[in-house]
Design a protein with these regions (language model features):
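H-loop (His-switch) and adjacent beta-strand-loop-beta switch element
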Residues: 234-247
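ABC-family P-loop ATPase nucleotide-binding domain
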Residues: 1-31, 244-263
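ABC family nucleotide-binding domain
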Residues: 21-230, 234-237
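A generic membrane alpha-helix/interface feature
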Residues: 106, 143, 171, 242, ...
């Protein structure tokens, strides 16, 4: 039961509306060493919108601000000015407890390095966000975790530890872990950087599956033009500014404007 006066976590609808806005950035700026002679602004007034149906690539040269932006969106850091809204709720005024709850329930993270806990089984790693949030998982949650392992192609691997899995299999566990809370937004930072092309394609297909079936918006940082071209839209970050937000042609030959550019 929630604490009196405490808002519930932001969670996606079980029957999702693909047009629901998941993320909105309004004139977001980020500076370091504020007020000092060494102050430097790394993000310059960014505006961006993502809907549940969006599957977007975030591209840009090293040092363009991609990781900084992902940290802000993922509530791992706060902007110097501007506002970030998740499912319509402003995040800059959230206290630490609220930010932690939202981050744990509404945002999924997948990184280049999977960061699995070596002493835990694959299933225990998948259930870790639920363990952190509420203690011992229920039988229903364990069944959901096993279902996710099956979804990512690891049926029968629940009791294996990371050192008994290949690199690609470990990354699949990380994907299942990111999705166990049914987040409204999935942030993926170079998730296929250490994988061979076949495994990278498999991981990408998993992201696409959850985007379409569960209305989980995806923002994927990648340096691989082959992968970014398969996303619905590509957001280009140059020297801390969004310089392009373009729709990619769909397989059916139609092109939709990215939601960030829709009225």
């Amino acid at each position: 039961m929630s604490e009196p006066g405490r808002k519930p976590p932001l969670v996606g609808k079980s029957s999702h509306d693909n047009q629901q806005e998941v993320l909105r950035l309004e004139r977001v700026r980020k500076s370091y060493n504020v007020g000092l002679p060494t102050e430097v602004e790394v993000l310059h007034g960014l505006d961006l919108r993502l809907q549940r149906s969006d599957f977007a690539a975030l591209v840009g040269a090293s040092g363009s601000g991609k990781s900084t932006l992902l940290n802000l969106i993922g509530l791992l850091d706060t902007p110097t000015s501007g506002e970030i809204l998740l499912l319509g709720e402003a995040t800059t005024a959230m206290d630490d407890v609220r930010r932690t709850a939202v981050r744990g329930h509404s945002i999924g993270f997948v990184f280049q390095f999977h960061h699995l806990i070596q002493a835990f089984t694959a299933l225990e790693n998948v259930l870790m966000p639920l363990i952190v949030a509420g203690g011992k998982p229920t039988p229903e949650q364990r069944a959901m975790g096993e279902g996710l392992l099956q979804d990512v192609g690891l049926k029968g691997f629940a009791d294996r530890r990371p050192d008994q899995l290949s690199g690609g299999q470990q990354q699949r566990v990380a994907v299942a872990r990111a999705l166990v809370t049914r987040p409204a937004l999935l942030l993926a930072d170079e998730p296929t950087g250490n994988l061979d092309s076949k495994t990278a394609d498999d991981v990408f297909a998993l992201f696409r599956k959850f985007n379409r079936e569960f209305g989980c918006a995806v923002l994927l940082v990648t340096h691989d033009p082959r992968l970014s071209s398969q996303c619905d839209r590509t957001v280009t970050l140059t020297d801390g500014r969004i310089t392009a937000d373009t729709a990619n042609p769909r397989l059916d030959g139609k092109t939709l404007p990215p939601s960030g550019l829709r009225p």
